[in-house]
C-alpha cells in the first residue's frame, strides 16, 4: 500500500499546473535557511520533478567582463558545457539578445551546442536584475516541440522571483 501511495503522490506532482507551482517557487525563494544556490537547486528540482518534459533544468550566470556564461545549479544529466561564450549556442545567443529563445527541434537549429542525443528541444529565458541580464534559466526536453507561451510566462515568473534574491 505504501508503494501505491508514493506512486500516486508522484503522479499528482507530475500533473501540477504552472499556477499550482508558482506559490511553491515563491516559498523556496523566501526560505531564509537556504543559500541562493540551494534555493536555485531546489527550484530546479521542483521543476524537473513537476513537469514531465523538463528533463534538464539549470541556470547559467553571465560574466560580462569575459563575455561568458557559467553553469550554476542544475538538475539532470551531467554536462560538459560549464562555460559558454556569449553568442554560442542557444544560451549564448540569449546572453546577447536578452530575449526568450524557444527551440522546438534542436536538430533544425544551426547555432546549437549538443548536450546529449536525447535532447530534442530547449527553452532559455533570461534572468534580469535591475534591468541587467545576469543569467538565464535553461530547460532541455527529450520531447519535440513541448514548450508553449505558458512555459515562457511561467519561467519569466520564476526568474522574477529569483531576481528578488539579488
Set out the residue ranges of the language-model regions:
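Intrinsically disordered, low-complexity terminal regulatory regions
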Residues: 12-74, 78
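Short, Lys/Arg-enriched N-terminal segments with co-localized hydrophobic residues
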Residues: 3-15
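A short, aliphatic-rich beta-strand micro-motif
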Residues: 121-128
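Sensory-domain boundary capping and coupling elements
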Residues: 128-141
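Short hydrophobic/aromatic beta-strand element in the GNAT-like acyltransferase core
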Residues: 56, 124, 136
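Regulatory sensory and allosteric helical modules in signal-transduction proteins
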Residues: 62-68, 72-114
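Short loop/turn motifs at secondary-structure junctions and domain boundaries
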Residues: 51, 114-119
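Juxtadomain coupling helices with adjacent low-complexity linkers
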Residues: 22, 26-29, 141-166
Amino acid at each position: 500500500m505504501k508503494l501505491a501511495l508514493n506512486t500516486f503522490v508522484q503522479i499528482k506532482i507530475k500533473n501540477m499546473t504552472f499556477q499550482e507551482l508558482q506559490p511553491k517557487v515563491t516559498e523556496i525563494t523566501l526560505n531564509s535557511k537556504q543559500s541562493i544556490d540551494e534555493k536555485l537547486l531546489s527550484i530546479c528540482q521542483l521543476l524537473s520533478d513537476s513537469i514531465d518534459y523538463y528533463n534538464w533544468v539549470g541556470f547559467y550566470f553571465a560574466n560580462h567582463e569575459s563575455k561568458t556564461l557559467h553553469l550554476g545549479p542544475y538538475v539532470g544529466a551531467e554536462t560538459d558545457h560549464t562555460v559558454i561564450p556569449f553568442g554560442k549556442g542557444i544560451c549564448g545567443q540569449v546572453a546577447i539578445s536578452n530575449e526568450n529563445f524557444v527551440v522546438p527541434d534542436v536538430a533544425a537549429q544551426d547555432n546549437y551546442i549538443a548536450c546529449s542525443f536525447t535532447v530534442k528541444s530547449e527553452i532559455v529565458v533570461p534572468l534580469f536584475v535591475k534591468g541587467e541580464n545576469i543569467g538565464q534559466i535553461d530547460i532541455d526536453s527529450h520531447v519535440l516541440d513541448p514548450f508553449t507561451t505558458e512555459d515562457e510566462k511561467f519561467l519569466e515568473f520564476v526568474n522574477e522571483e529569483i531576481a528578488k534574491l539579488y
